[in-house]
Every structure is written in C-alpha cells, then in structure tokens.
Regions:
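Macrodomain-like recognition of ADP-ribose-binding/processing modules
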Residues: 1-263
Length: 263
C-alpha cells in the first residue's frame, strides 16, 4: 500500500470512529483554511509514514529457520561482503546480448562488470566437477546441462547457480515444483561450499524467469515464502547468516514481517 493510501485510510478511520467530518470539527474556519489544514495534516502523516517505512526497510527482518540465522533486507547484492549467489540457466550460458542474457539482469550485470575473462569463466564452469548433485549431461546441442541447484564457485565471492531451463526461444523457464527442488538443492549446495562465510541470495524467480504453469505466476511474497520454506525442509545447517537481498520494489511488494508468525 502506498503512503497516500495509508494516509487516507488513517484519516477516514479516525473521522468515522469519531463520527465527525472535518467541516463539523472546525465550523468557524473558511473553506480555504480547511483545505490548507487538510494539506498540512496530509503532508505530516505522509512524512511520518515514509520515515517509518524507511527505518523498517533499512533495519530488515531477522529470522531463525531450523536454528539458522536468516535476514531479509533491501540492498545491492554486488556490494554485499560474502558469497553472492548469481542465477544462470542450466547451460551456464555467458553470452550477454539481450537475447540469451539481458544486460539488465543480475546475470548480465555480473558477467559484464565482474568477469575479467569469459574464457576463464567458461573453462571453470566446464572443469569444476565438485557437486553433491547429479553430474552434468550432454544435451542435444552438445552442451553440458547441469542439474538445477548446482553451484560453481568463482573468485572466492560468487556462487553461480544453475537456476532455470532454457529453450530454443531463448526463454528461461521452470515449473513451480522444479523451482522448489532447485531451492532445496541450492541450500544443500551452499551448506557444502560456504566455508563459514555469510551468503547473500537475491529473490530468485522475481526477474525474467517464466513459470510453466499456464496463466499463473507466483507473487514476490510467494517466492519469498518458498525460499524460507525450502530452507527449512532442506535440513541444511549454517553457522554464518543467510541474507535474502531484495530490491526496494520487491520489498514494497512483500511483507517479510509476516514470515515471523508463519515460520
């Protein structure tokens, strides 16, 4: 809900409970003074609500899931100090051309701004065979296809995640059940490789990925709940905190505080 909606809701509720109108409360004021009064009250309430939301957003939400410390906060994933999870498709494609990979996606920003050599990255992806999951298989196009949830370490600060399928129409996609299975695999893989270092994860599935269920796509709140739920069911254990990093827009569309009563 926007700040304006909150203000109108508050004013409407108060006047309804009190059983008065603004005009009735100030019968001696001219209409112009009443308008000024309403604008001042509106501005003050809007400012208070925005300050409250800003403080709440910066503070984040702290949870414990199976004893694991988990934080949900707004931030820039790339500025976080620790392992940063970057979603790729199942082939670990690295071509940023706004067709295979969008320049504006986390995947695209990572490759263009944080990869020194694509040849080195591609070589690492092909040669790093350490995984608790199934080994990669050769697809019809001859490329290696990795199980969803597979992680590849890069530069000691990035965890590259095989997150989605990729079809001939250059669409990243998966079903909701595959999404859940991918997350369970992710948490178990993170537990294997994190080495006691904090891990930062974006809100997976909130970008360009398509869900195969016809006519339906999960809300950001659904995705957030699913990430927490799969962490719980994975039985993975961490000594360092797991942080789910949201954009400001995603934070506005979710209610992380609701998760405290849901866990």
């Amino acid at each position: 809900m926007s700040s304006a909606s909150y203000v109108f809701a508050i004013v409407g509720t108060v006047t309804s409970i009190a059983g008065v109108s603004i005009r009735g409360a100030f019968p001696d004021l001219s209409i112009w003074l009443l308008i000024v009064l309403v604008m001042v009250v509106y501005a003050l309430l809007t400012a208070v609500i925005r300050i409250y939301k800003l403080i709440r957003t910066k503070a984040g939400v702290q949870l414990r899931v199976n004893g694991n410390p988990v934080e949900i906060k707004v931030g820039d994933l790339f500025s976080c100090n620790g392992w940063k999870v970057i979603p790729f498709n199942e082939f670990y494609d690295t071509t940023v051309d706004n067709i295979t990979i969008s320049r504006h996606s986390l995947n695209g920003v990572f490759i263009e701004d944080h990869v020194d050599s694509l040849q080195e990255l591609n070589s690492l992806i092909d040669k790093d065979a350490q995984t608790s999951l199934s080994p990669p298989k050769a697809a019809e196009n001859g490329r290696l296809k990795f199980e969803l949830g597979t992680l590849k370490r890069y530069k000691g600060e990035f965890l590259l995640l095989a997150f989605s399928h990729f079809n001939d129409l250059n669409e990243a996609h998966l079903t909701m059940s595959e999404y859940e299975e991918c997350l369970v695999n992710l948490w178990r893989e993170v537990s294997r490789v994190y080495s006691g270092i904090p891990v930062f994860v974006p809100l997976l599935g909130s970008g360009l990925t398509r869900f195969d269920e016809s006519g339906w796509s999960p809300s950001k709140q659904d995705l957030l709940k699913c990430m927490i739920c799969t962490l719980r069911t994975s039985k993975a254990s961490f000594s360092a905190p797991i942080t789910i990093v949201l954009t400001e827009g995603a934070f506005e569309e979710t209610n992380p505080y609701d998760l405290k009563g849901w866990i």
